[in-house]
A protein has these predicted regions:
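Aromatic pocket-lining residues of Rossmann-like dinucleotide-binding sites
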Residues: 4
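Generic secondary-structure boundary/loop-capping signal
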Residues: 57, 92, 112, 117, ...
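Rossmann-like dinucleotide-binding domain for NAD(H)/NADP(H)
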Residues: 120-121, 127-128, 144
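Glycine-rich cofactor phosphate-binding loops and adjacent beta1-alpha1 units
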Residues: 7, 23, 28-124
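C-terminal hydrophobic helical "lid"/dimerization subdomain
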Residues: 38, 68, 131-188
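Conserved SAM/SAH-binding beta-strand->alpha-helix loop
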Residues: 18
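Short beta-strand element of Class I
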Residues: 10-13
Length: 188
């Protein structure tokens, strides 16, 4: 959300089902969308007067879950196709793997998903994927931080000693309230 605002987005939506994360998104100036209250696509289309967003970003990856907590690796991608306008762009930074032997469905086990390619094609959307090339952005981001225009530290909820790492991972993995991002300090 913060990056989208820095890049000039006039309105940013954050879809989640954890109240603490939605609160943080609102504090950053984004519009929080609670996917447990109502379908996220419907909320976004309503807030954009049926037009959809110019761009969407998939940040969850293959471990996405539906509102009942069941893994559904296709959910965010298909929701983005539905909520992004025709000719809009979709960025995928969430991790997708070539194989997931522990997955519940056969497609997911093969690293595949049921993707709404028909709607994607009909709308003329574009997808970009992969890890960010941080070397391209780090100098500019450092300048933005230095001049007070970017503050990525605002999403950090805990700064802990390295020895506290195992306990921190348990809280983070369990999605305990208030555990958004953790920084482990080896020298502390």
């Amino acid at each position: 959300a913060h990056s989208a605002m820095i890049k000039g987005a006039s309105q940013v939506f954050v879809v989640d089902n954890h109240p603490d994360r939605l609160k943080l998104a609102a504090q950053m100036g984004a519009t929080p969308i609670n996917s447990l209250e109502k379908e996220a696509v419907d909320q976004i289309l309503n807030l954009t007067h049926g037009k959809g967003t110019d761009r969407g970003c998939e940040c969850v990856g293959y471990q996405c879950c539906d509102r009942h907590g069941h893994e559904a690796n296709h959910l965010t991608m298909n929701n983005l196709v539905a909520s992004t306008k025709a000719t809009g762009g979709i960025g995928v930074v969430g991790v997708f793997v070539p194989q997931d032997p522990g997955a519940k469905n056969e497609l997911a086990k093969e690293g595949k998903m049921a993707f709404d390619f028909g709607a994607f094609w009909f709308k003329g959307q574009q997808i970009r994927t992969g890890q960010a090339n941080v070397k391209v952005y780090n100098r500019r981001l450092a300048e933005l931080i230095h001049h007070g225009r970017a503050k990525p530290s605002q999403i950090i909820s805990h700064r802990l000693k390295l020895a506290e790492g195992p306990d921190a991972y348990k809280h983070f993995d369990a999605r305990d309230d208030g555990w958004t991002k953790v920084v482990l300090k080896p020298a502390a």
